[in-house]
Amino acid sequence: MSEEVPQQFPSSKRQLHPSLSSMKPPLVAPGEYHRFDAAETRGGGAVADQVVSDAIVIKSTLKRKTDLVNQIVEVNELNTGVLQTPVSGKGGKAKKTSRSAKSNKSGTLASGSNAGSPGNNFAQAGTCRYDSSLGLLTKKFINLIKQAEDGILDLNKAADTLEVQKRRIYDITNVLEGIGLIEKTLKNRIQWKGLDVSKPGETIESIANLQDEVQNLAAEEARLDDQIRESQERLTSLSEDENNKRLLFVTENDIKNLPCFQNKTLIAVKAPHGTTLEVPDPDEAGGYQRRYRIILRSTMGPIDVYLVSQFEESFEDIPQADEPSNVPDEPSNVPDVPSNLPSTSGLPENHDVSMPMKEESTERNMETQEVDDTQRVYSDIESHDFVDGIMKIVPPDLDMGVDYWFRSEVGEVSITDMWPDESGPDWNQMITFDQDHAGPSDNKILEQPQTPSSPTPEESTATRSPTGS
């Protein structure tokens, strides 16, 4: 039987049964096929031929199975060769394979892997690469920091624990140190200083604590809102009640008794929105006396100024009308004037030098005039018109267009001197008008601007003699 099979093997290709010519793969192993034919019950010759044909079919199937086994063995050898460590360059160069051979091997690998899941080999290769990635290594390194005592980690122990080279650990530490998350305490020792690294259980507890804190803050905010609403309702009822409107005021003593206003001059200003307030330096002029000024400017409406309280020593340095000036006399070319000439102003004989003046200085004359204006305002405040209570301060009727404070710092030249106004006010007429209505204390203030230059003896005699009669 075994000798006849090789002799008839070449003719088996022509004698294949029609049922075996189908391209569908067998459902079971070829050895398990069994045919029951009606010719089997007939003559023995027919049965022998059928057995021979069955034997031929089985032989061809066994050959295909053998080829499949050989392919599986080649696939296993290829897998083991890929995962092995590459040979060093000293041992010899590996044989170069063509691209077609590589493609055939890859195709064989894919066909052999179909016995299991389709992507097992690719998943294994990707998993191995991810295991050695820097991202996963960084996560493991952070976990080591969490588990370290006092947050200090030894890099040598970390390299041994993670089973990687130290240069990989140094790559991670350099990046974390660059962004300020860790710091080096000692050699090969690092400490976490960035965001709070807490354990999983601590994170859950912190979330619960934060939620409780948010609820407490919300309750506190609601309580404060209720208190604010109640206070606003009380203020509204207090201000809108007709019985309380007559009590909505403060007295002068209420203001003066405040500790912050003790021994101070208090001035109340009622001005519209956008009013500018300037307080020049009292020592800016550099004169022998200090001048205090408050400059208010508004383009939206009138300004009202009230004197609430006046400190007694506020104007102590200003010379009074009956006090001689302590300023030394300035040398001048004025000849001696007889002392027996009458003086109607009631001032001492040296009243001509009560205000220092220069003959050829327009700026000094303007400063003297402004000092006189300041003294006039002070004299008005100290006059008999000052009564108990709050007094309204009215500025003097002078030319408010005269520029004094807006002056140039270079050369001390004022803008008024640079552009003189020829059609300015006639000071002689203003002085004559003021002389008719001013008291004895105002004569001194008004007589000083009349001497911008050194007068001659004849002019002084002519000026004084009519008033002495």
UniProtKB/Swiss-Prot annotation:
Induction: Up-regulated by light and by auxin. May be up-regulated by E2FA.
Region: Disordered, residue numbers: 1-28, 84-118, 319-374, 426-469
Polar residues bias locations: 8-22, 100-118
Coiled-coil positions: 202-246
Disulfides per UniProt: none
Keywords: Activator, Cell cycle, Coiled coil, Cytoplasm, DNA-binding, Nucleus, Transcription, Transcription regulation
Stretches the record annotates as Leucine-zipper: 210-238
Region (Retinoblastoma protein binding): 403-419
Biased composition, class Low complexity, residue ranges: 447-469
Protein name, entry field: Transcription factor E2FB
Source species: Arabidopsis thaliana (Mouse-ear cress)
